[in-house]
């Protein structure tokens, strides 16, 4: 019987070249028809890695496959449950390449494209069946099953793998790698606060608890901003029609590739902003004695919440009306720096506004505000055509010339001007430190990333030539700007977090903490 069933299964597989594969993550189901080739009992196929099915397979390898021979749809066929994995071994990739070409040459151009291969845009996948159901409505026994236990991952191992991937999904949803945009202003606000405490002779009043609460609250605010941006860019179709998305533009794509529902993303935003509000009110109570005390903490919290949800959220939609860049600069510049500074210098001012050294914190926030805005600015270059199509009037869209093709010379010129102004502001803080109490000479160390700035400018100019070339591949050129996107993030991170003033302050604080610990241990 087993041999007879094996022959029936092989006959179906040999007489078909396409299969329908169903994938699912968190209740989001997808289906796609793909060409396949046999490799023993395994099924091998080629696809693009950013597609919905490939993204869902990466998170949940369990798939369902339906195969019907040509002309026998619905009469004789196979229904297969299995586990699907992306092929990573180079020898296996070569084998998969040959197998797929034996079935179809329709995708050969993409399979051999060096750019797509280098950037991991295309890939080969293997389905390992765990259960094969043979269906034939003309036979007396219409359904017959074959199980392949060796292909099935143990329940415990699968649960562990899915758990890790679920964590990865949440990190992707909140765009965790971009939380450096929050770390930099909080670190700067903390560095200025530590300096003020030290100058007032009360450095021992530094509170790590308050520092971590500030950092956590600010990080949740950014998560809320990112998630709400994903949700509202989905409802406006901005991310749906964006065909050149990357890790730096086009959102997290968790909605578009079926990893999370729009409702789940919106809930993520609302829960995150609720966490921010809760932490903010607690900090306000600690500083003022009242959860709703009239303090800068309360007002920066209100403004920050408005900017986070109103960046792309209805009905405000700041990002669609040309105010998004300003919102980003304010939210991740003065609001975070000054908010952190106010909380951490509470032992000095005791909630008396006139005793708060806000000017120094404001000045320190200027360079980082410009630089974080430039991260968004350069990331909007790839998004410009799709943003313009849905009426998202960012300043890149507003300043570009659209004559059938989006000309980005003016936005690039402004990018460079703002970058120069950011480092002039850094130098100004250093000069102020030489003659006043409103700066620090250690700020000069933050000029070191200028070398990276020069490199970013050079790469951007080279990219602009390609972008304006009418013969250029419009699907590939946007991805060639990624090095400039990465460089801009690096410039912001290095300038904010490797400012010697910050390192010096934190080092002194760490030394003091270490000394206290040593004294305690020595009795």
What residues fall within each predicted segment?
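Membrane-embedded alpha-helical segments that form the functional core of polytopic membrane enzymes
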Residues: 186, 200-228, 296-309, 354-378
